[in-house]
Amino acid sequence: MAASTQPSPADRDRTADRSLAVELAKQSGVLLRNLGALPLHKGQKVAYIGAFADHPRYSAGHPRAPQVTSAIDAAVLHDRKIQYIEGFPADLDQRDEAEFLRAVAAAEAADAAVIFAGLPECAELAAADRRHMRLPECQNNLIARVAAVQKNTVVVLHTSGPVECPWADDVSSVLCMYLAGEGLGEATDALLWGDADPCGRLPETWPLRLEDTPCYLDFPGDGVTADYREGVYVGYRWYDARKMPVRWPFGHGLSYTGYVYRGAALDADTLTPGGTVTARVTVKNSGAMRGAEVVQLYVADATGAPVPGGRVPQALRRFAKVDLQPGEEREVVFTLTPQDISRYSPELHAWCAAPGRYEIRIGHSSRDIRAVLALQYADAKI
């Protein structure tokens, strides 16, 4: 047997590993909402509320990372003016009235309040399915109460997927960190206080409620059998096809800077079998902070041809992340082929595209399209 070329744990560069973990977590955080409370500013007195601030949930499956820094540890390291109040436990839906009122009072007296909310690990086990999409009631109640007394209320979410957020319109800002690994604490601190720009984008739609999801009518099924009857209408395709309002759409993510799109164009207005078409767009950082924009390209079938199983309104086909300094602009280029406008036909056992008109949609998210370009295709089978 050949000797392993992998370094032993003792030989690994832990400093480099940790730096990479922090950077990955920074780029994974998604700023879902921001009415101005973020970024926090030096000198502000900020109440940190919620046990996840001190005991971060950074992964699933009983992880054992060699070092995990909490948001509180990172704030102390950077000399932030914070006061920590537990408010609610991380592992139970349990309300302690005295602790609840102490958290509300601290939030009201502060310049801003950051509530670290999320699901306990027992709610997201691989061996069991979630029965609902709610946060623990003790968390929802405290968020609502704090938002009523503190206009600069920020919620940081630690979950592995979407949750219902009934308080979303009442808080100033929402930052979703998901389960961002051992670099979670430092990354959360950097994003909250503006040392880094949020550049993550949602990999899924966040619905308003469980009843809006495509699986609601079929789950949990009959015994050990669950039918997946949504067909091609998976994820954002379901919500777009029904023109349903959602909490936050697929691909969404805000920034502390701004981006302007201009000059979107195709190098040809017709795509032929075996050919390619190039889509271009120029993106400019119009703000005062370095950031990274994720440019997304969707394809919509506008041929009107009948489609067995249903036609999805649009489908993501390309995306590119572009780092930009303030005032910098860069051209983003995508190359498209007939595969990108095609669907698989079980009857023909082939990828097919109806002849006619397609729309190339370029934008910031699935529901923030900045340019629509027309493209013709002339063949029915690849």
For each feature predicted by the language model, list its residue ranges.
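C-terminal non-catalytic regions of proteins with extracellular/luminal or membrane-system context
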Residues: 1-382
